[in-house]
Amino acid sequence: MTQVQASKHDAFPWDQRTQQQTQGVDGMAGTSKSARVFTKGWGESPWSIDFRPLPRLLPEQVDFAVVGGGFTGLAAAAWVRKLAPEKSVGVFEAEQIGAGASGNTGGMVLGESSAGDLPGLGDVLGGFRGTLDELGIECDLQLPGAWEIGRKEGWKDSPISWSDSGRLRVVDEVAGGTADAGKLVSGLARAADRSGASIHEGAAIDDLQFDEVRGQNPLVLKMGSKEIRAGSALIATNAQSLELGGLQKRATPKLTLAVATEPLTPAQIEVLGLDSGKPFYTVDFPYLWGRTLATRGVIFGSGLVDVDDWRELKQIDIGSGRAAELMARLELRVRNLDPVLQSVGFTHWWGGPILIARDWKPIFRHHVRSDRVIVLGAYAGQGVALSVYLGRWAAEAMLGLRALPDWK
C-alpha cells in the first residue's frame, strides 16, 4: 500500500492537503550518501511478480470485460468465475499485470478508506483475508496492527521516537498489517487464470462504445481497429486511462515515492521500535509512512509528484527533476529519523501511481453512460486490502447479486 491519508479524523481542504503532502522538510542536517542505482522511469520496487499469462488471441466477445490487470481487476475476474463459471471473462491490461499501482505499492494493509469508514463498507480486512483464503492465495499476509504516529500527544511509552519536524511517537494503534504485493498480484492472476478467465497483456482499450441498438451486446471495447463486444464491464484502471471511466474531472492522478533500506540488524529494528512488524503512518504533516520487509529492510514513503494529465505519469523519471528532488529529501529525512539510520544504505527507490478523488472516497459507481459498466478505483494510496475487497463486491454487482454502495 502507498499510504497518503493524513488522518481519519482530519478534514483538510483538497488544495491544502495535497500541497502539504508534497512539501519536503527543510533544515535537515547532512547530505545524501546513496548512489542511486535504478532503471529510468518509476524505478524498481522490492516486489517480484512471477506470473505471466500465456499469450492468446483476443476474443470477439465476452460476458464480462475487466479493463485493468491490477488488484481490483484480477480479484473481480477471479470472483466472477468462481460464482458463475459458465460466464466468459476477459481481463485486458494495457501493459503487464501489476504494472500500475498494484506492483508499485508499499504493501501496507489497512481496513479503512482514506476518507475513513464509509456507510455499508463492512469488514474490509476480514473480507480481504477471506477472499485470499477462498482463492488459495499466499502473499505473506500479516495482520499485527498498524501504528498511527504523530508529533503531538504521543504515548509516553511509545516504541517509536523519531526526529522529524518534531518528535514522532505512536498516538494510536489500528487494525492492519502488511503483505507482499508481488505475491498478491501473482496470486490473484493465477486464481483468475486457473478459474478460466482469459488475461491479455499489452491490450490497451482505447475507447468504449455504447450502442444500444446492438441488442444483446450493446457494449463495445475498442482497441485500435479491434472491437470486443461485452455484456458488462468493469473499469479498474485507477490512475490511468481516466477517460474510459469518465474520471478525468473527478479525481487527480499523482506519483507517490518510496525507498527501501538495506537489511538492518535485529538490534537496529528494535531501536527503531519496529520489531512488532506493525506498519506506520503519520496523522499529521509532513507525511511519512512505512513498514519492515522480510529482508529486515525498512520501506519509508513520502512525497507526491503532480501531473496535469494521467499520460504524464509514464513520462516521470524519478532520477531527474521534481521527483529526484523529492527522493533526495526523503533519503535525508530517513537518515535523520534516528542515529541508527544516519549511515544507512538504500536498495530500492521507486514511485507508484495513485488516484485521489476530491472527497478522498473510493469511486465505486456505474458509468455515467451505462449501468452495464462499473467504475472502481481512486483508493488514494490505501488500496491493497480495499481493492481486493471491492473487486469482489464489483464481481457480485456485475452478476446482479449485490447493489453498489452510495458514497456520494
Residue ranges and their predicted role:
Residues T2-F64, K82-L83:
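Extreme N-terminal leader/targeting segments of oxidoreductases
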Residues A75, L208-L293:
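Flavin-dependent oxidoreductases
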Residues P263-Q268, E312-W349:
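Flavin-binding catalytic cores
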Residues D10-W14, A29-F38, G126-R190, R194-G196, ...:
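Flavin (FAD/FMN) cofactor-binding and adjacent substrate-gating region
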Residues F64-G90:
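N-terminal Rossmann-like FAD-binding beta1-loop-alpha1 element of flavoenzymes
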Residues A99-G120:
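Glycine-rich active-site loop/strand segments that organize a redox cofactor
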Residues L83-N104:
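Glycine-rich FAD pyrophosphate-binding loop
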Residues E331-K408:
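C-terminal catalytic lobe of FAD-dependent flavoproteins
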